[in-house]
């Protein structure tokens, strides 16, 4: 079969186009070449018997050359392969597919002979054509296309690397005679391309072994055992119409898949370096130190909890650097033990934290599911029938569990009501007045201009509101200057100071207005804000009515002694009155002291139960931290209650609030408050410990 080297070798080689000197015969004279690539059919000439005349000089030339390069030449040169198969070609010193391919003349055989020649394993030369057969010429025409490629390739037998001693000896025996007769330089060729090696290795089982000859089909043998080439018309058009490289293409794929890369210029391309993971590094370290660590299966760990600790898995105990003295055996064992203890403690700590996170996530998911189910009930059943269902037991239980955020603002507005009959248009009127006042304050800010203003007007100044707004929920960064709700909060507070100049602005109002803004629209938030501050308890505190404030403190102490008598006596021993911690809680409605989500839940029940729940929540906080407060003195108690811990949860707080009984000898909050008010009017101050001070 012919390859790309074969086509390149014989392309353009024609005795008529390019004159080539004829080969030298035994007598040193130029022998005219015969034949050529004219495409004519060549009839095989039967080999002569012993004693007949010698072969023509060109045939001797080729016979000597091929004997040195690939074994003895077939005597017939017309497709006889028996003698060629008897002598194996020496590997490395024989011709490659690029050398012998151009010696193949046009295939004029039939399909059966073509298949036989493809499985032969050694190229067979066609015999020189007879005179007058398909335009074949004499000896010059036959030898010219063969001699020129041989001279251009400068082929000669090289050293052999075949392990077969017989082939090496037989090939080396004829090297000297071939070189002397041809006069060609010594050129050593191994495998001229990467495909030849694979062809020799992969097609070794197809080659006939030494001493055997490939039998020819009977149909292709002429009389007397000679080989006859079938006549076929056609020239180079038929030659190039065939598929020249089907076998080479298949072998190329096998070479590419079997080898890591092409070996170009004697260099093998480096392999791609794989990045090492932490597990590979740890395995290499354990293999180097001779210690194996049994890693627990990851699947079982993931079944227990979703959070897999990862920080300690990358800790690797390394030896000392080479420039430092090596560790002793005892020291290495001690360090190994300390390392294992450190890793074990870190694992326990991470597992504990992972369990805690998992528990928090479960509680959060459970709460979200309950809120989602409650939202459907509130939207579809309760809100459409608010006046009828607001006092039912089912609604009160849902209310206690917390309102869904999507309906919280609506429920707050309905629960607080609008006794003042404030409309959005009225809010716009008071807002415009507030803007005019701020403008006048900015234009005239001297002390002489401020002397004639009332106390409420002074507290309604722009500077005081700005200062308090900047301290409202500072962790959220939404009410400060430049935040999305800064202007809205500023407008509501300014409009309220114009609406209630008798109350004005008091520190703590900004937190109440901010919580309403987060759940309501601007106008609705102002309406709820004004009605909420109009309640008796809030009005007493924000107007700083000391007599009313003392009544609320006295009523609170009655229930404090009833529910937490031990803590009540502890506070009395330090002379700690409720005003130290209750003022901040009541002024801001716990929105400053508690986390925002927990404060909103307190607001939910406050809208249902009124001012009573504010003081009940205070008792619940004292009950929650009763054990801690009993161990503190006056200063630490005041500091602790002023700034409560941030990790307080709604479940714990509301469980403590539920344990507080707001009854004193069958008297409820309103009844106790009325009795305390009556006692104050009569001048009896002995019933309230707060009033004694």
UniProtKB/Swiss-Prot annotation:
Span list, region Disordered: 1-57, 91-120, 156-229
Entry-annotated residues carrying Phosphoserine: 202, 233
Keywords: Acetylation, Coiled coil, Endosome, Phosphoprotein
Pfam family, one: RabGAP-TBC
Listed GO MF terms: GTPase activator activity
Domain named Rab-GAP TBC: residues: 402-610
Modification type N-acetylmethionine: residues: 1
Biased segments, Basic and acidic residues type: 106-115
GO biological process, alphabetically ordered: regulation of autophagosome assembly
Gene Ontology cellular component list: autophagosome; recycling endosome
Annotated compartments: Endosome
Function: RAB11A-binding protein that plays a role in neurite outgrowth.
Subunit structure of this chain's protein: Interacts with RAB11A; this interaction recruits TBC1D12 to RAB11A-positive recycling endosomes.
The protein, known as: TBC1 domain family member 12
Organism: Rattus norvegicus
Organism lineage string: Eukaryota, Metazoa, Chordata, Craniata, Vertebrata
This protein's encoding gene: Tbc1d12
